[in-house]
Amino acid sequence: MSKSTFHQTSPSFVQYTHATDKLKPAPHGMNTRGNNLSSMSKNTGQRKQRSKSIHGLPVAPVFYPDKEEFQDSIGYINKIAPIGEKYGIIKIVPPAGWNPPMQLDMNKFSFRTRRQDLHMMDLRFREIVSYDERVYRFFCNLGMELPESFFISNTSIDLYSLMRCIDSHASLSEKELKVHVWKRILRELSIPFTNASLKEASDLYLRYIFPFEDFVRKYQTSEDQCFETDLFPKFFTKDEHSNISIKDQKTSKQFNPETNESVGILQNQESKRNEQIKQQYMPADNFGSNDNHSHNKKRRLSSLSTNNNHLCDNCHKPVNCEVEDTCKEAYCTKCIINPYEFGFETGNYYTLSNFEKYCDNFKKNYFSKFKDSEITEDIVEKEYWKLVKDNNTSLEVEYGADLSTLDQGSAFPSLAKNPVNPYSKDTWNLNVIASTNGSLLSYIDNPVSGITCPWLYVGMCFSTFCWHVEDNYTYSVNYQHYGDTKLWYGIPGDQAERFERAALDIAPDLVKKQKDLLYQLATMINPDELQKRGVDVYFIDQGPNEFVITFPKSFHAGINHGFNINEAVNFAPKDWLLNGFSLNGVLKYQSLLKPPVLSHDMLVYNLATNPASEISVSELRPWVHEAVKRELGIRIMIRGRYDLKEILYRELMEDAENWQCQHCKAFSYFSQVACSCKSITVCPLHIEYLCKCDLSNKTLRLKVDDNELQKLLSY
């Protein structure tokens, strides 16, 4: 099928390959990298783009601009945006002859990797492990050891899957379940219903799941409650808690980190309550017995340290707990109730050359089982998801991610080092595109690493960039300088909420309790699971000398098929502002208490007070009015509630940390509240989170006074 040509007012502004189209085959010998892998030479031959992935995903659009169209990067992207935003991601193949030389020294460029456990990135698996860990912590506090594995009718079962199945057919608050309910539960678990399987399933529920869920249900705290230490009487009933007077709470002695002592009114009460809980949840028979539903194998302790001083083994805050000699660990209520937060561990230091050899050896050894078969993109993708799903196999890989070009230098030529190289000022050079004409990021006061200054990424086979949207819902452009295929998955921006609902359905505990989970860049979800839940997913295979563009609010993720070197940066054409992505991105981050990287108000103010060729007055006016009216409304509200000193504070912007609200993390560009007792500040909406000092010590700092804001309303 031939490429489709789209027309607007000018001839053929874009060439576009449909999802059913294929790219032209690569020249002979260009499907894999050459043998001289340690050299600076690159294989930039065009590779064949698959028409479908192993998941049956359709390929996203691929564009082939001619030399004239390719002259203006932002202009060209603006033209194809109406098509690209329907897919979330697209690929752009430069015209023949465009091939900037990579500037990195393979033997001198050094970096540190991140370690990635393929299992732990998978959202479903992490939900299972998180539940298992929380149950384990609960029973640790009771001095009880858990079996390492559980069985029903010789079928291995994890407590999380059994809990979810019970919860879908009954209530976890019910201690005794009807026989017909157990029949449905076992049927859903594909376990034959017998008297033995009924007893084994019921025993697992009563021994492990019900006690833990009952504890969580009774002592679950709201999201807004603050856990300062575990000395708070978490084991009190509501009535018992109400009997402690305010005076008692204030005068009771607190934990002293120097002496490691915690005494006072709460200590004896909590110790008694711990003993009550042990009696309440301790079964009459031996918990670690070698019965028919579990192995009598001690569960590996999650910490090698002992806990003679009763500090939480996870957060290291004090915890009062009667811990038996058989189990030295103890955990505070917060670390039992809430899922732990997952993150990548740091890996080793490498040069590019050394890492390439390491990656090539790994890939060669791993795929040696395929003997003489060609290692295609399909094979690598299948193996990746097989490894993620296989509970009996654990594989760790390494990834050189988020390597700032401010520190290491870009792989593109730069004007500073290569002033006569034409690629140094090319609009597709990632050092240029963020601040080129047409990108609103040129109106940001200071460079932002990873946003206006590119980052480098060095991949190995199976290394992963997890599902995420770009900071502040901006566009991104990713260029591959060298190496093996980088597989991309993308979702249209208008399906972001559908994606979030799918994630909630897959892992409700994690998503509910970690509001910013999908913004942590540490979560993978199989495209099959997303498609089952009505999410449209597209894919692209990226090779050397190819660009991938992601669109605002588009969740995307991907897998490296081997050693490769990529570079990425963000940019923001005017439609990013005019279509509401700038403001909505800031509001979304504020709701998650997640720090943004850009200030929407600063951008709008700078555009309004400086001539901007990128955007007209009529286009900008609604956004100026929105920002000004919102700020004036906040000032009216604050002045009505509090009697604060006010000063004009023009230096507000010099240090980003000093104008970021310490509660909601949003940039408070026009005004902020400070106190003489500390250096931190908050936005006017969150003055109550600043400190407990008298209002006379607090000041409302204004970067822009009311009169100047009022003048902007006539913009």
Curated annotation (Swiss-Prot):
GO cellular component, one term: chromatin
GO molecular function: DNA binding; histone H3K36 demethylase activity; histone H3K4 demethylase activity; histone H3K4me/H3K4me2/H3K4me3 demethylase activity; zinc ion binding
Residue ranges annotated for the ARID domain, each copy included: 125-217
PROSITE patterns: ARID, JMJC, JMJN
Pfam family, one: zf-C5HC2
Domain JmjC: from-to ranges: 422-588
Positions of Fe cation binding: 468, 470, 556
Comp. bias regions, Polar residues: 32-44, 252-269
Residue segments, region Disordered: 21-53, 247-271
Protein name: Jumonji/ARID domain-containing protein 2
Species per Swiss-Prot/TrEMBL record: Schizosaccharomyces pombe (strain 972 / ATCC 24843)
